[in-house]
Structure formats: C-alpha cells, structure tokens
C-alpha cells in the first residue's frame, strides 16, 4: 500500500478481508443469548470471568456466520480451502477477541454495557487478526487501516442504531 495516499482499493480490500470477522461479531450479538460462555464463574476479585454478554449460542452462531462468509469468499476467489480456514479463524478469532475484551473490562471493574473506548471497538479485530496471523501476514499499514475503518464503521453503526431506537446510547 502506498503510504502517501490511502486508495479506495486498499480500503475495499481490508473491508473484504475482514468481512468474516465483521459478520461474526454482528451475528454473535444478533443470535446471542442463553448460557454465558463463562458458565457463571466468578473470580477472586468478585467479578465474573467474562459475564452474561458472551454466550455459547452467540459464539457458535458468529463462528458459523464467519465460516459461511469465508466459504463464499473462497468460492469467489477459487480457493475454497483458504476461504474455509480464513473464515473460521477470522470469525472465531473475532468472538474470542470480544470475550477477551469482556474479561479485561471485568478486571478493570467496568460493568457490562458501560463504555470502554477503543477496547469496545477493536477487541474483536485484535482477536481475529491474532488468530489468522499464522496463515495471513498483513503489512502494518493494512492493520492500521483495518483499525481506522473499524472505528469509523463501529461508530457509524452505533449512531444509526441509536437514531433508529435500537440502542439507548449513541456509542
């Protein structure tokens, strides 16, 4: 990527690459509910390991959606196996990143639903990129671009959801 100017191809590429993670993250929220992933475990600090916001159903649904998006990308690119692997790693990684973010928030004594700027927006990105990194090595400028795009997309989606009455807060 030419660091002097971010071109539209780079932006579209990183969005396309991250689609399994983006869709998994959204799907985990939409299809979530039920038993929490941490099974109600409370640590010595008196706080839950992760909390009620990360569930088995959301994790399974999000991982499945990430896999399906990866399969579609694999079909489009002519490499189904790469699509399966990257879709699975990006999708599951996104959900594990979100769970890790919840774990960190609990340790920082931040209750569920309370904001943790940057962590709330990028935890799933870090999880996805870490899990996929053994097979896909992205240049640092693409990683930075992914973070910037994700921040904009996340904020935009939250504002729209707030304006539509789907969220109580704009962030």
Curated annotation (Swiss-Prot):
Keywords: Cell membrane, Lipid biosynthesis, Lipid metabolism, Magnesium, Membrane, Phospholipid biosynthesis, Phospholipid metabolism, Transferase, Transmembrane, Transmembrane helix
Domain of life: Archaea
Keyword set includes Flavoprotein: no
Biological process terms in GO annotation: glycerophospholipid biosynthetic process
NCBIfam families, sorted: PRK04032.1
HAMAP family hit by this protein: CDP_archaeol_synth
Annotated protein name in UniProt: CDP-archaeol synthase
The species this protein was found in: Methanothermobacter thermautotrophicus (strain ATCC 29096 / DSM 1053 / JCM 10044 / NBRC 100330 / Delta H) (Methanobacterium thermoautotrophicum)
Lineage summary: Archaea, Methanobacteriati, Methanobacteriota, Methanomada group, Methanobacteria
């Amino acid at each position: 990527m030419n660091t002097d100017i971010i071109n539209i191809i780079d932006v579209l590429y990183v969005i396309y690459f991250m689609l399994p993670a983006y869709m998994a993250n959204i799907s985990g929220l939409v299809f979530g509910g039920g038993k929490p992933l941490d099974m109600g475990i409370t640590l010595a600090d008196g706080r839950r390991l992760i909390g009620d916001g990360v569930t088995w159903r959301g994790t399974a649904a999000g991982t499945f959606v990430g896999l399906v998006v990866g399969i579609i990308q694999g079909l489009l690119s002519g490499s189904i196996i790469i699509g399966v692997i990257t879709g699975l790693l990006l999708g599951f990684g996104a959900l594990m990143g979100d769970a890790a973010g919840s774990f960190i928030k609990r340790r920082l004594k931040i209750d569920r639903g309370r904001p943790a700027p940057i962590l709330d927006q990028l935890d799933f990105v870090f999880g996805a990129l870490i899990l996929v990194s053994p097979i896909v090595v992205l240049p640092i400028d693409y990683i930075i671009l992914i973070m910037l795009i994700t921040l904009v997309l996340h904020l935009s989606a939250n504002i729209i959801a707030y304006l539509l009455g789907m969220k109580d807060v704009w962030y």
